Design a protein with these regions (language model features):
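Secretory/periplasmic and organellar redox-cofactor proteins
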Residues: 1-64, 77-142
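Short, solvent-exposed amphipathic alpha-helical segments in soluble enzyme
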Residues: 65-69
Length: 142
């Protein structure tokens, strides 16, 4: 499969998110747009796989989302590939990141359950923190 994006996890990277409020909101908005084309979510060893119906421009969107995630969440590996009919996103990490990775895997469901354009970033942040993710920048408006 041709690869759009691939980056391995950084060894011993801390379980942190460096995104600020605007970055996190933009990322969530990007996911919301991408998930309109999501056809399947699969658990894989140490991570998850999101499978999308290929659409014009979707590969570029997913590549940009994965690159921003890889810059922020260095404890995870990201691979986005294309087989022509489908675009596949895989994310994995080591056991210490498992609860966080599981939480991220549920993002399509969480955003589907929260269909408002002004989705509740604070609720998403609380879920990620409960899974063990530490935010190093303010993601909630004061």
């Amino acid at each position: 499969m041709p690869s759009y994006f691939s980056r391995a996890a950084a060894p011993a990277a801390p379980l942190i998110c460096t995104g600020d409020h605007a970055q996190v909101r933009a990322q969530i908005d990007g996911y919301r747009a991408a998930f309109e084309h999501l056809i399947q979510v699969e658990a894989i060893p140490r991570g998850f796989r999101w499978i999308f119906r290929a659409q014009p421009g979707l590969g570029a969107l997913l590549c940009a989302l994965a690159e921003r995630e890889a810059d922020c969440c260095r404890f995870m590996s990201f691979d986005v590939t294309d087989d022509g009919a489908r675009i596949v996103w895989e994310s994995t990490g080591d056991a210490s990141a498992s609860p966080i990775i599981d939480e991220i895997a549920r993002l399509p469901e969480r955003l589907r359950d929260e269909p408002r354009a002004s989705h509740d970033l604070a609720a998403l942040k609380r879920s990620a923190e409960a899974a063990g993710l530490v935010f190093t920048a303010a993601t909630e408006r004061s």
